Amino acid sequence: MRRFALAFAAGLLAAPAAFAADAYSLDPGHTQVRASWNHAGYSTQSLLFRQVGGDIKIDFENPSNTSLNITIPVAGIDTGVEAFDKHLASGDFFQADEFPNATFVSTSVEKTGDATLKVTGDLTIKDTTKPVTLDVVVNNSGEHPLGQFIDYYKGEWVGVTATGVITRSDWGLGFGAPITSDEVDLFISAELKKN
């Protein structure tokens, strides 16, 4: 965190020509989108979305120029229980056969601290689009230390963690609510490589 904060501060002081919105790609092996919820007061359960991708542009000098257009495949939902995965993909929830992807498109990015951002965007699930705000922590940025051993990791990288809360019934995912909580916690962890 300290290393990023120093790098971020240095970036803010650098000449404007040195920085612009650079394109980054998500590393599918180190990017996870998790959702968790309260199961009738008895436990906390979660699911994992895999193979998240999209178009990402990051501007360290002016974070408001940063943009995200993220695609989240819902057909590959993973809870660890095959029968539940199939139920979540059904018409009671994501209706994955008709709507195979959810999307998140940023509408604003605000710097809130040395290594923190508030990202607001439009989340589309099925045929419903509503705004969502994520609190983002930039864990690190710069040359990936694994680059000295593995060619894939050579170059500039950024690591982030993001959290947020949605009300699932707002997107037509309200089956079982409120016995099973309508509020769902989102947790995103990602590594991004500069193109």
Give residue ranges: language-model regions:
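Low-complexity, acidic/polar, glycine-enriched regions of mature
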Residues: 20-195
